[in-house]
């Protein structure tokens, strides 16, 4: 593994342990050349996924981009990073085990919306506003009224 600080090819693993519900390995590494310390994660990749964008263009699936979309929607919200990682890992697992090598960005967006519902209502509205391309205040009102109706039906399911 190349050192991100000095570019040396010779780094050493100091510590390895399971992470994220045993779906990845967290490794602490050190560079003998510059003394830099950094962390890497190793995950199983069942298959190479391609995302079909709305324009029809195909791009490789990027797990980090999925994490960033959660982080943007949940910015300044009381949602722990660990819960985001579990949601992302679940989505990736479902995508990889679907048997498909190409998946539409719409399908991914629907899975993110579903996961966001259980994480945070505000994050859900934020993500939905981008995913569903809200342009009017009524679009927000409709989603918020759906959330309020859900809360009224089952106030403990929050």
UniProtKB/Swiss-Prot annotation:
In alphabetical order, the GO MF annotations are: ATP binding; DNA binding; zinc ion binding
For this UniProt record, give its keywords in alphabetical order, as a comma-separated list: ATP-binding, DNA-binding, Metal-binding, Nucleotide-binding, Repressor, Transcription, Transcription regulation, Zinc, Zinc-finger
Which parts of this chain are annotated as the region Disordered?
Answer: 1-22
Required cofactor names:
Zn(2+)
PROSITE patterns, from UniProt?
Answer: ATP_CONE
Q: Where is the composition biased (Basic and acidic residues)?
A: 11-22
Superkingdom field: Bacteria
- Zinc finger intervals, unnamed: 3-34
**HAMAP family under this entry?**
NrdR
Task: Please give the family membership noted in the entry.
Answer: Belongs to the NrdR family.
Function per UniProt: Negatively regulates transcription of bacterial ribonucleotide reductase nrd genes and operons by binding to NrdR-boxes.
Q: Which PANTHER family match?
A: TRANSCRIPTIONAL REPRESSOR NRDR (PTHR30455:SF2)
Q: What is this protein called?
A: Transcriptional repressor NrdR
